[in-house]
Amino acid sequence: MLFRSRLFGACVDVVGIVNMQTFLEKTSDYRRKLREVEYGPLSDPEFLKTISPIHKADKINVPVLIGHGFNDPRVPVEEAMQLAVALKDRKQSPRLFIAPDEGHGFQKLENRIYFNERVVQFLDETIGARKPMAIPNP
């Protein structure tokens, strides 16, 4: 999205990591060790900054819908909040849905239905509804 933004008309972020440093700082010790192997060590904040989308938020020039569970044990909800604030600071109007009774992702049926309805509505409004493809007869 950040590097090919002109290809996209909208963005839906679900439980996304946006700031690698704050993500690692707020992650449990055992999970941090696993993630540092994948993303880089917390002891190298300059590198983490280079791979953190939050520091490139000025390149996001399309509407954004953000979804997150308030009790997410893997990606703290603060990640979603940081993105929403960064976009608002740039005069954008992100849509934010925080499910108060969810963890990582939307597991409860009512939350999945609600969020997916918001996604469809958001995409209809931002990139437009498309006609369904005709399915050829076999």
List PLM regions with ranges.
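Active-site-proximal cap/loop segments of hydrolase catalytic domains
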Residues: 1-138
